[in-house]
Each structure stands twice: as C-alpha cells, then as structure tokens.
C-alpha cells in the first residue's frame, strides 16, 4: 500500500518509525516535510540532512508534487502541522486519513468551553466525526481532550514517538551504571518553566544533606540556565552539579547509560516526552511526573519506574531518596524499563501494529492492537493519570 506521512519536519524521533515503515510496508512510503526546522531545535542537535533521506520530500521545494500526494495518496498520516488547508480537501473527499496529535488542551481542559476555540475544533475535527479519519493519540491524555468535544468516536488509537531503540545485554547495560560509586542522577531538556528543572536541583540538595555520594547532571539549556546555576550556589551544592549545555541526541544517550536515576519533572504541557523512551531504553530508574503525556502509557509505578503526582515535589523527593539508598531497586526498575521499550514501545512494533490496523480498516473490520502502540486509546482524564499508573 502507499503511505504518505506528513509532518512539520523529519527528526531523530520520527526517523526510526519511518525506517520501520519502509522495511515493513509492502508498498511505497513517503515522508513530506512541511517546514524547515526551527533554529533552536537545530542547536539542540535535532537537525538531519534530508538530502541523505531519499524518502523525504520538502513541501517548500516541491509544492505541487507534495500536495498531490496529500490529496490522492492511498493512506495519509498527518500531524504536527497547524495549517489545516493542506489536508481538508482529502478528508472532505472521504479518503482514509490518520491524524496524529498531542493534546489540544495542554493548558487545561477548562479551555474547551471557549466558543471561539470550539468553533475552530468543529472546523478542524468535529465535523469529520463520520468521515474515514482516525486519530493517533501522541500522549495518554489526548483521547480525553478529544472526547470532550465528541470527535473521533471509537476511532482513537494509542500512539506516541519512537526514538531509536538500542539493544543491549542486560548485564552490559547495568555494567555501565556500576562504574561509579556515586549515585548519578540525570535531568535533560530545555530549561524552561513548565519543565521545572529547579525541582531536580532542590531534590538533590535535600538528598545531599544525608548522602554525600550523589552527583546531578543537568543536560540542556534555555532561559532558566543562569538562574539554575545560581540556585546551586545558593544551596551550596555547585560542586555536586554539572551543567553540560545542549548535547546531541547521541551524547545524551551516553549520559543516560551512566545514570542510575533519570528525573523527568515536566507538567501537563509535556505532550509526550521522548526522553522517557530513551532513558528507559538506557536502563535508568525513572522518576517522572504524572502530568507527562508518555507516562501513563510507558510507566507502571513500582514496576518499571516511579510516578509522582504532577506538582507534588515532596513525593518526588521521597522517591529520589528511596532509590538513592537502594541500588538494587534502581537496577530492577531499569531492567524492566528497558524490557518495556524492547518488547512494546518501539518503532518496529508501532509500524507493525499500525499496518495491521490499516489493513483491518480497509477490509471494513477495524481491529486495534491488543496493547501498546495502535491499541484502543483509553479515555484517561489528566487528573486520573496518577492512579492509572498504579492499576
């Protein structure tokens, strides 16, 4: 079959899924890049040379060719693009289409009552509820957002982002982490308010009052970086914290391999959070906020990670202290996290599951995957994600 994947731009989070589709699909697969990557993302090491990827076509270079593929392609996956006019003719014509989307109410579901917002949601989504269009939910709370506006009834599937899976022997993976006596804690991302990097620093400051053998690496940069460095000085922990600046994706993976604990402190504005996939793949014991879109899909509290209630820094600190004192639990959580990515939440599984779903829809017998990518998206309200990880 012919599959056209349309998104804002190709990056290292999309590339493994594209390669899996190229490998598994028995027909043509094309990725259409709709816009150049932002400079900030390029500086973060996200840039790829599209000229080295023959399946990628850039809309700004081949507009007529690309638009024809969007209009006439057998199956189109469309997401990450704000402008709706590119896809509207296709949906109105009743051609099989998959939208993929992060949350539409990241700032809070109370916003769905806005008349102006509802008008746009009707135009973009609700009016197509009976058309041949399905939703791939890139985050556990996406289905809840769209359920509020009665869009995509019984046509929503669990989805996400699928960074490169790297295979390791479990003993090899744990050996990386046993090279240092100190407990190594890693935080990685843009240093902006809704990612709450200061929570990681406060947690380690509390831990250092009781345990000397701890080190925190803050990987990334952003508007809060200077403020965070000053905070470590004020708390007297600057010798125990290293700021690396932005690192390439490969360099981040190296840091993850060495880390015992990965702290993921974002709130509900983190639509997915692909660093979670990467940290789990690297065998880290993850401590993550329940507000992060990927968390209810990927983590089971106490089995393959620790999940604290969004905004509850006290609970997060308790988990940091608990794991810092118990390396065996760190290793158990890390090994189970690795297995979650190896067996379920990876690009190959996502491609295989989605292709089966597409074929089932084409034969007018829609059937979701039993679990993981392309399974039925449960309606998980944002306030229920914490409990969901404890099922």
Would you name each region that the model predicts?
Residues 246-247, 254-259:
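Short alpha-helical donor nucleotide-sugar binding micro-motif in glycosyltransferases
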Residues 115-135, 144, 148-149:
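Membrane-proximal helix-turn-helix segments that form the acceptor-binding/catalytic region
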Residues 300-302, 306-313, 321-327:
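Conserved acidic donor-binding segment of nucleotide-sugar-dependent glycosyltransferases
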Residues 257-271, 284:
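Acidic donor-binding loop of glycosyltransferase active sites
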Residues 315, 322, 329-343, 350, ...:
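A short, well-ordered alpha-helix in the C-terminal region of glycosyltransferases
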Residues 53, 229-247:
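Nucleotide-activated donor-binding/catalytic signature segment of Leloir-type glycosyltransferases, i.e.
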Residues 285-289, 299:
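Short hydrophobic beta-strand element within catalytic cores of glycosyltransferases
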Residues 176-195, 201-204, 217:
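Conserved donor-binding/catalytic core segment of Leloir-type glycosyltransferases
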């Amino acid at each position: 079959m012919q599959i056209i994947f349309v998104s804002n731009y190709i990056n290292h989070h999309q590339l493994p899924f594209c390669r899996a589709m190229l490998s598994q699909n028995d027909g043509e697969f094309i990725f259409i890049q709709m816009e150049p990557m932002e400079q900030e993302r390029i500086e973060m090491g996200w840039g790829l040379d599209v000229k080295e990827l023959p399946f990628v076509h850039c809309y700004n270079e081949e507009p007529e060719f690309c638009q024809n593929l969007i209009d006439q392609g057998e199956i189109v996956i469309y997401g990450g693009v704000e402008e709706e006019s590119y896809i509207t003719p296709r949906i109105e014509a009743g051609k099989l289409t998959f939208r993929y989307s992060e949350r539409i109410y990241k700032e809070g579901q109370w916003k769905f009552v806005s008349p102006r917002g509802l008008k746009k949601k009707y135009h973009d989504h609700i009016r197509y509820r009976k058309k041949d269009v399905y939703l791939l939910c890139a985050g556990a709370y996406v289905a809840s957002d769209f359920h509020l506006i009665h869009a995509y009834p019984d046509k929503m599937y669990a989805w996400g982002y699928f960074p490169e899976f790297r295979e390791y022997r479990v003993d090899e993976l744990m050996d990386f982490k046993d090279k240092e006596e100190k407990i190594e804690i890693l935080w990685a991302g843009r240093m902006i308010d809704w990612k709450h990097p200061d929570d990681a620093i406060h947690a380690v400051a509390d831990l250092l009052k009781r345990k000397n053998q701890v080190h925190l690496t803050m990987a990334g940069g952003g508007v809060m970086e200077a403020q965070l460095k000053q905070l470590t000085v004020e708390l007297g922990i600057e010798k125990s914290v290293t700021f690396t600046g932005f690192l390439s994706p490969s360099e981040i993976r190296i840091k993850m391999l060495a880390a015992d604990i990965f702290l993921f402190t974002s709130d509900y504005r983190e639509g997915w959070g692909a660093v979670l996939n990467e940290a789990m793949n690297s065998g880290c014991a993850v401590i993550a906020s329940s507000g992060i879109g990927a968390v209810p899909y990927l983590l089971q509290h106490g089995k393959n990670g620790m999940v604290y209630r969004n905004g509850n820094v006290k609970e997060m600190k308790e988990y940091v202290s608990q794991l810092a004192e118990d390396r065996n639990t760190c290793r158990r959580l890390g090994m189970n996290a690795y297995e979650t990515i190896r067996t379920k939440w990876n690009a190959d599984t996502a491609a295989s599951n989605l292709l089966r779903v597409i074929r089932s829809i084409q034969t007018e017998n829609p059937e979701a995957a039993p679990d993981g990518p392309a399974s039925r998206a449960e309606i998980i309200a944002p306030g229920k994600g914490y409990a969901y990880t404890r099922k």
